[in-house]
From Swiss-Prot:
The gene is metE. GO terms for biological process: methionine biosynthetic process; methylation. Signal peptide: none annotated. Keywords: Amino-acid biosynthesis, Metal-binding, Methionine biosynthesis, Methyltransferase, Repeat, Transferase, Zinc. L-homocysteine binds at residues 430-432, 483, 598. Its EC number is 2.1.1.14. SUPFAM superfamilies: UROD/MetE-like. It catalyses: 5-methyltetrahydropteroyltri-L-glutamate + L-homocysteine = tetrahydropteroyltri-L-glutamate + L-methionine. Gene3D superfamilies: 3.20.20.210. Pathway: Amino-acid biosynthesis; L-methionine biosynthesis via de novo pathway; L-methionine from L-homocysteine (MetE route): step 1/1. Pfam families: Meth_synt_1 (PF08267), Meth_synt_2 (PF01717). This is 5-methyltetrahydropteroyltriglutamate--homocysteine methyltransferase. It comes from Campylobacter jejuni subsp. doylei (strain ATCC BAA-1458 / RM4099 / 269.97). The keyword Transferase applies.
Length: 754
């Protein structure tokens, strides 16, 4: 029995990659220094994996920003607008990921989307008429040889041709048709080069196969691989899937020329049933994904061994594997000195998951009497308490009316127009303002008990004063307090709710250099005291204008945390919803007129197969949001915000959330959402983000005016809000002030024309 992993976290044990790239962006280090840091990280990760006894060690899973972008660059799928900047290869790469504004030109970044059902974001490759698709890159070969120099025969990992083709944004059908053959030829050339290097295994990741596949999808997949696999020669090909099962194509894969199939037995609900029904091919190896790559709880070896024994009825050719990339979990628990050992022993981050694979291999190669098995089973005895009877009783007492807000949206809209007295096209921001080094230092000093609570609060209040003053000077209509007291929109609430645990160093990559530290939902959740009330009251006291109360919604708190596995996601979300509901009512009672409840991650756990959308997710996720705000008065305006996602197919469900205003991140997708909003007669007032805050470029008044006009051409003027597409926490003040001034100027210019 051997073992494998799909891929490993890139950012480093202490986010070394993040800091190295950010230094390069600020021109504080050279290209050579950045690439040296990256090379050292790769070497360290390979050695960690090798030392853990993993047999199939991945290469080419490392990325400076995003592996989808890496794959596009490998095959020269780069839009002409980036080529025309005439930058060197590295800066052209970063121009695609961040946008570019300088002496060589002014271009926006590629669109960003959620990677399937995760909180990782990928960049959408763009292919236009001038794109010459060919194997022009060498990253996959260089990194294979790099590992080889360290004495490691690695398994290069690459996004498969079918998934890549489905993810590319083609200019039109003609461009797409021409690209198909060119891309196939490029993959064939890649196979030839890997054969020249005498590579043994290539892993092709095809997660798109876990979606609902049409006949056309299956035909396209077969067309690609019937040709491609004829060129594999001595190269062995592992077709790797994750985030679901292969029910639409599994029987065909058994008859294909792939040397191995990677199945997900964690999220793949039907993976085991498919093997039981159709068996497994004698000429193939099964890479069995049984170590959860998306959650941090320790593996129960008894369950894994039971699964392996069942699979062995159908094949003896089994490799133990992760369910997906370990990119989605933190690096290692060894940096967690503050978590009680009674909890910590029950968690496995990326490095510990390597150990779990090693243990399982050793147990399977010996017997179940192995001490490693006994030690694992001991972990699950005498675990810390998780239940709270008061929370259970409160959930049980919920009635149907607790999930419905009255009066109707139309009635509320009239009441709110009269009460709030806002102008046409009201301007606002999404919530957070830049968190400079002094803000982070103040928070750290307070956490380390180097300053008093009073000093900490006074510092934040001064920052709030400055933030309110800046917004008033710019001329925004609805203000925010800036969120200087918050480290993260989820972690901050988790820290103030009972039932959560926190890591010191549990960082996970969200996109590029953006890392998040997800809380761990351990027990039943409740609110023990007000969380945001003091900050919101203080901020509102500083201005005659409305200052929004800012909260994170229950679905996002769940989706951006590591969830419990002992109760349903529905129950866990409803517990959080009740806690946030208490906060909403406190804010309203304190005179806060607009309360924003962000559901940035609403789409994240939406099942990848449409048949499961309602029964497994939307039927409880939407009511959980309703539960949060159903108790407020008609005059209180409820806002929500949603991050990069595909919304067009769930807009009716989003409308059913019954918020009064919703802001979307829409700028990177060229506001393509507007046509769908119009088509479904979306009732909620909307703020489609008018510029991309994830890029350092400052949009001009002219650019913003054109964007606002585009929105007005699609939606009624009474329904529109003007705002950036996300919070401003990660930007510099000079960028923020310049952009917001242009936003207000553009809005005022358009108002005069209405």
């Amino acid at each position: 029995m051997k073992n494998s992993i799909i891929s490993y976290p890139r950012i480093g044990a202490n986010r070394e990659l993040k800091f190295a790239i950010e230094k390069y962006f600020k021109a504080q280090s050279s290209k050579e220094e950045l690439l040296e840091t990256a090379k050292n990280l790769r070497a360290r990760h390979w050695k960690d994996i090798q030392n853990a006894g993993i047999d199939f060690i991945p290469s080419n899973d490392f990325s400076l920003y995003d592996n989808v972008l890496d794959t596009a660059v490998l095959f020269n799928i780069v839009h002409t607008k980036y080529k025309n900047l005439n930058l060197d290869a590295l800066d052209e790469y970063f121009a695609q990921s961040r946008g570019y504004q300088g002496e060589n030109g002014d271009v926006t970044a590629l669109a960003m989307k959620k990677w399937f059902n995760t909180n990782y974001h990928y960049l959408v490759p763009e292919c236009d008429d001038a794109s010459i698709i060919a194997l022009t890159g060498d990253k996959i070969f260089k990194e294979y040889l790099e590992a080889k120099e360290l004495g490691i025969e690695s398994k290069p990992v690459l996004i498969g041709i079918f998934t890549l083709f489905k993810l590319i944004a083609f200019k039109d059908k003609k461009t797409q048709k021409l690209a198909k053959e060119k891309l196939l030829n490029a993959y064939i050339e890649l196979f030839d080069k890997l054969n020249e290097l005498k590579v043994t295994w290539l892993e092709l990741d095809e997660p798109y196969l876990v979606y609902d596949l049409s006949k056309e999808d299956i035909a396209l997949f077969e067309e690609f691989y019937q040709e491609l696999l004829n060129h594999k020669k001595d190269l062995k090909i592992l077709l790797q899937s994750y985030f679901g099962d292969l029910r639409d194509i599994y029987p065909k894969l058994l008859e294909s020329k792939f040397d191995a199939l990677g199945l997900d037995f964690i999220e793949g609900k039907q993976s085991l049933a498919l093997v039981q029904q159709y068996g497994f091919a004698k000429d193939k190896i099964l890479f069995a994904g049984l170590i959860n790559g998306k959650n941090i709880y320790a593996n129960d070896y008894a369950k894994s061994l039971k699964l392996i024994k069942e699979l062995q009825k159908y094949t003896q050719n089994i490799i133990l594997n992760t369910s997906c990339s370990l990119l989605h979990v933190p690096y290692s628990t060894e940096f967690e000195s503050k978590l009680d050992p009674s909890y910590l022993k029950l968690f496995a981050f990326a490095k510990e998951k390597l150990q779990e694979l090693k243990d399982l291999k050793e147990i399977l190669n010996s017997s179940e009497e192995n001490p490693l098995f006994k030690a694992n089973q001991e972990l699950f005895k005498n675990i810390p308490e998780r239940l709270d009877e008061k929370v259970k009783a409160r959930l049980k007492a919920l009635k149907k009316e607790d999930f419905t807000r009255t009066p109707s949206f139309k009635e509320r809209a009239l009441i709110q127009k009269e009460f709030l007295k806002l102008p046409l096209l009201p301007t606002t921001t999404i919530g957070s303002f830049p968190q400079s080094a002094d803000v982070r230092s103040n928070r750290l000093a307070f956490k380390q008990k180097k300053i008093s609570a009073q000093n900490y609060t006074e510092f934040n209040q001064q920052k709030i004063k400055e933030c309110i003053q800046i917004q008033e000077e710019i001329g925004l209509d609805v203000l925010v307090h800036g969120e200087f007291e918050r480290n993260d929109m989820v972690e901050y609430f988790g820290e103030n709710l009972k039932g959560f645990l926190f890591t010191q160093n549990g960082w996970v990559q969200s996109y590029g250099t953006r890392c998040v530290k997800p809380p761990i939902i351990w027990g039943d959740v409740s609110r023990t005291k007000p969380i945001t009330l003091a900050c919101s009251k203080f901020a509102q006291s500083l201005s005659q204008k409305i200052v929004k109360g800012m909260l994170t919604g229950p679905v996002t708190i769940l989706n951006w945390s590591f969830p419990r596995e002992d109760i349903s996601l529905k129950e866990s979300t409803e517990q959080i919803a009740l806690a946030i509901r208490d906060e909403v009512l406190d804010l309203e009672n304190a005179g806060i007129k607009i309360i924003q409840i962000d559901e940035a991650a609403l789409r994240e756990k939406l099942p990848l197969r449409k048949s499961d959308w309602h029964s497994e997710y939307l039927d409880w996720a939407i009511p959980a949001f309703n539960l949060v705000h159903s108790g407020v008065k008609a005059k209180t305006q409820i806002h929500t915000h949603m991050c990069y996602s595909e919304f067009s197919d769930i807009l009716k469900e989003i409308d059913a959330m019954d918020a009064d205003v919703i802001s979307f991140e829409a700028s990177r997708s060229n506001l393509s959402l507007l046509d769908t909003l119009k088509a479904v007669h979306f009732k909620t007032e909307v703020g489609p983000g008018v510029y991309d805050i994830h890029s350092p470029r400052v949009p001009s008044v002219e650019e913003l005016s054109l964007t606002i006009e585009k929105i007005l051409n699609k939606l009624p003027k009474e329904q529109i809000w003007i705002n950036p597409d996300c919070g401003l926490k990660t930007r510099a003040y000079e960028e923020v002030i310049a952009s917001l001034k242009n936003l207000v100027t553009a809005t005022q210019k358009i108002r005069k024309q209405l």
